[in-house]
């Protein structure tokens, strides 16, 4: 796993754990890739302590020395830019084979002048334009404009990102990220096999879901601690896949979350441990639409100064004083059905490859974690299905 993928995965799991602890028993769904990408675009113009805090939260600090060496003789864009031609290539590659739309944009007030170099770097490295707006005099018009742009970029799946009254006239900058993805399963589920079945949420609570079913050859790992099954469901191009972490036996999804970190996730999903088996797959058909205001979450992770008008250092973005990040909003949509997915976001001893039954039962009738990622390990989406 390359440094960028490692950093984005670390960031993904940090955000996931914060969202989960703040939304106990609720569904979680977001796109770490677009959030990471958008914040990196902001980092281009951040300096001083503000930049140090952001680098730490984004896990760039662990390999920034290598990047500084690479960019020592370069004045065109900051060191962060060196990292992200890979992101552009990744999104371009995915877009060739799947319907993927990423919406990242910084909206800045017209009263602030922005460095031409920063604007140039955003366009060059992130294919994103900085949009100047009038928050103070045209608050409602600006809100509608942002919502319309996001709706267009996500094929109409994400609407009303900002509800009426949620954008303050005193705002100076708003960072927006949204994503839309539609992929077909390599092995589709047959609609005639979908039946009503119970989904157990714990503590005596259950609900009825539409449970999809198919038998096929899939990659599967059996983990002993915490006890779970790890199933890989590939998409039609075989470049992207959904990974489901399902607790079994007496284990719960919260136990999986406690053990979840980059090292463990790599170990659980290592191709050498994912054995091809004949599997009876039962997974619920579901759709989620989730919106998060990430200000508080990012502050809790350590990115504090950027939100404070007195402390934010965005001098790489603008010569004007008083520029700070007003709001970070992220909204994602996912629809998992028989055709595929539509989305707008230990030690080696823990792996068991012991003898398994000829056909393994994989029945997702309780809360589980799921990730959609590419062949390089970049996580496009992360989620938890806990409440139908």
Curated annotation (Swiss-Prot):
GO terms for cellular component: cytoplasm; extracellular space. PANTHER family: SERINE PROTEASE INHIBITOR, SERPIN (PTHR11461), SERPIN B11 (PTHR11461:SF199). InterPro entries: Serpin_dom, Serpin_fam, Serpin_sf, Serpin_sf_1, Serpin_sf_2. SMART domains: SERPIN. Its main location: cytoplasm. Disulfide bonds: none annotated. Inhibitor of serine proteases. Has moderate inhibitory activity for trypsin-like peptidases, but also some activity with cysteine peptidases, cathepsin L, K, and V, and the serine peptidase, tryptase gamma. GO terms for molecular function: serine-type endopeptidase inhibitor activity. This is Serpin B11. The record marks 354-355 as: Reactive bond. It is found in: Cytoplasm. Belongs to the serpin family. Ov-serpin subfamily. It comes from Mus musculus (Mouse). Residues 338-362 are annotated as: RCL. Keywords: Cytoplasm, Protease inhibitor, Serine protease inhibitor.
């Amino acid at each position: 796993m390359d440094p960028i993928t490692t950093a984005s995965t670390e960031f993904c799991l940090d955000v996931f754990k914060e969202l989960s602890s703040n939304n106990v028993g609720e569904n979680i769904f977001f796109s770490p890739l677009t959030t990471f990408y958008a914040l990196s675009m902001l980092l281009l113009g951040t300096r001083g302590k503000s930049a140090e805090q952001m680098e730490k939260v984004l896990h760039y600090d662990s390999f920034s020395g290598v990047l500084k060496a690479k960019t020592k003789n370069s004045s065109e864009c900051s060191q962060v830019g060196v990292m992200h031609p890979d992101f552009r290539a990744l999104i371009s590659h995915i877009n060739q084979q799947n319907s993927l739309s990423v919406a990242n944009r910084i909206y800045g007030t017209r009263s602030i002048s922005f460095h031409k170099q920063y604007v140039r770097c955003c366009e060059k490295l992130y294919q994103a334009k900085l949009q100047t707006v009038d928050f103070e005099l045209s608050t409602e018009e600006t809100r509608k404009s942002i919502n319309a742009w996001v709706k267009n970029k996500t094929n109409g799946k994400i609407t009303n990102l900002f509800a009426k009254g949620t954008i303050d006239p005193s705002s100076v900058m708003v960072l927006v990220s949204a994503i839309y993805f539609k992929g077909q399963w390599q092995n589709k589920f047959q609609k005639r096999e979908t039946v009503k079945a119970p989904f157990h949420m714990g503590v005596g609570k259950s609900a009825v879901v539409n449970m999809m079913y198919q038998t096929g050859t899939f990659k599967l790992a059996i983990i002993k601690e915490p006890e779970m099954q790890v199933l890989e469901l590939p998409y039609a191009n075989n470049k992207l896949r959904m990974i489901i972490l399902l607790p079994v036996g007496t284990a719960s999804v919260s136990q999986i979350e406690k053990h979840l970190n980059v090292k463990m996730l790599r170990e659980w999903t290592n191709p050498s441990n994912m054995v091809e088996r004949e599997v009876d797959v039962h997974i619920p058909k579901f759709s989620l639409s989730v919106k998060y205001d990430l200000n508080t979450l990012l502050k809790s992770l350590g990115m504090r100064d950027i939100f404070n008008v007195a402390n934010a250092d965005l001098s790489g973005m603008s010569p004007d004083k008083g520029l700070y990040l007003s709001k970070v909003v992220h909204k994602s949509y996912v629809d998992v059905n028989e055709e595929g997915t539509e989305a707008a976001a230990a030690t080696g001893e823990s792996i068991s490859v012991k003898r398994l039954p000829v056909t393994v039962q994989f029945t997702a009738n309780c809360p589980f974690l799921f990730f959609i990622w590419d062949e390089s390990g970049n996580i496009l989406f992360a989620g938890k299905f806990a409440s139908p």
